[in-house]
Amino acid sequence: MYYSSGNYEAFARPRKPEGVDRKSAYIIGSGLAALTAACYLVRDGQMKGERVHVFEKDPLPGGACDGYKYDIGYVMRGGREMDNHFEVMWDLLRSIPSLETEGASVLDEYYWLNKADPNYSLCRATVNRGEDAHTDGKFGLSDKGAMEIMKLFFTPDEQLEDKKITDFFDDEVLNSNFWLYWRTMFAFENWHSALEMKLYLKRYIHHIGGLPDFTALRFTRYNQYESIILPMVTYLKDHGVQFYYDTKVVDVQFSLEPGKKQAVGITVDHKGAVETIDLTEDDLLFITNGGCVESCTVGAQNKATGFDPTIKPGNGWDLWKRIAALDDSFGHPEKFCSQPELTNWESATITTLDEKIPRYIQKICKRDPFSGRTVTGGIVTVKDSAWLLSWTLNRQQQFRAQPKDQLCVWVYGLFSDKPGDYVKKPMRDCTGREICMEWLYHLGVPVEDIAELAEHSANTVPVMMPYIDAFFMPRVKGDRPDIVPKDAVNFAFLGQFAETGRDTIFTTEYSMRTGMEAVYRLLNIDRGVPEVWGSTYDVRALVDASVKLRDGRKLTDMELPLMGRIALKEALKKIEGTDLEKFLRQYNAI
């Protein structure tokens, strides 16, 4: 496998891999990484769909990319923010037919939508019960804070292993708008991995200017299950791929010899009926190890989620622990799933039932939430919330079957263990109605109306996810297994806990990249995998980000010691009248 960039490789179709007709594939899980692997097996691997088998422990596909209507109401555990340079995602979705527009792909539909209705926020944060916090697009970083970020940016990965963000940032960064934007947009906590923070900075350096108002982001028309997962599953079923639901893979058997590691069997549990499937070297096994939504608990309007991080038999953590015990190259799951108090947060889906709540939403987001177009344009963070509450409305309806007079709001709190500001209980102990009350309080709803509106004008379903931030925990090389471990001949790891270079976790792109790389490696497909977008190597992006991170202040305005000021002055004299001077002026650096 090799990486590539540019249209030559992007538009090429690979030859059929040698020996693919005698191979079969077994995929554990049906999340985005697993479905991507299945799609690439069919599209570029040219494997017959009937020879691809997908095992899913739940009754529906999609993993964390959910969006369903249950008896208790609508549920979206999370949302997906997309980037125009998710190179693998767009490479695949250009081939997945739209379910709504004949002759169009999912990418076509997405591209047209975001051209016609570009994303941007009119209110990024609130304070004092619904007042605009007036972050005003500013990062609010001092020169010292900017230098702390720059230092992290240039620190070698090896020096960041097992380091926390607070090992590099002090209050100059942590009390700034920059950190407010960053931690709530990406769900970072202060104690999370400094290495992952650095990778994020380098990965999205071209979007620094678009973070304060979310112009950097793009969204699907509906929830991610209906907009992404269903089209992929339909494509796979149309090609004959076999899906097995309510089916847990509880163990994997390996033959581990010097120079050769082979998966030789999987133990499958379908509703209590257990069987072992033998695997040969021509049977390719794709393992989704770990899982950010494992052990989640769902509440209801009048039921709290509680907090139960127990790792249950047959889930992604249990399987990974069993596998990891066999060989050190299979990773170290305990680094990620041993401290659920440091990896959890809680979300809730609030469905409005009448016209009473939407007017408070419109007052803050300054848009008609029923227009079918962008509403909040990303999350609105309640800056003075004890739960650090954020909420968002994407284009409504978020579900195709959603009544047109209802809105689906997604809410999440980073601090599920802190008492609320209105409801004096931790979020994890609150019913859906009580979470809605806390949200309404921060919207500025009159206190005397809060209980009535939460009870009769909304239905709220909370979800506690003990391991939703597990991949952000500090780590060292080897804690996550390589996608295809050294000497592996017929198996690969998939998803957020498999290791690939330069890309960042908690994104659709990371999951899809692991799926593509796994297939390309095991089948030796002769076509380049799109490399991670290289803006970190683009001097234009670097200079532009340096200026915007300092809210437009020029390099000549930096607080420097005397010798630094003299050196800068002399350097500027040297470049006077050159293209370098023109370049720096073009990007307002001088």
Regions found by a protein language model. Give the residues of each.
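Extreme N-terminal leader/targeting segments of oxidoreductases
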Residues: 1-25, 43-51, 69, 549-590
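Beta1-alpha1 glycine-rich phosphate/pyrophosphate-binding loop at the start
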Residues: 1-3, 37, 41, 45-84, ...
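N-terminal glycine-rich phosphate/pyrophosphate-binding loop and immediately adjacent elements
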Residues: 13, 19-148
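Rossmann-like flavin
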Residues: 99-206, 217-219
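Short, glycine/acidic-rich hinge or "gate" loops at secondary-structure transitions
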Residues: 103-111, 245, 527-537
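Glycine- and aromatic-enriched mobile tails/lids
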Residues: 120-121, 479-481, 492, 497-506, ...
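Helical element adjacent to the flavin cofactor pocket in flavoenzyme catalytic cores
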Residues: 202-284, 288-290, 302-303, 308-317
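C-terminal segments that line or cap access tunnels to active or ligand-binding sites in enzymes
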Residues: 205-220, 282-284, 289-514, 520-534
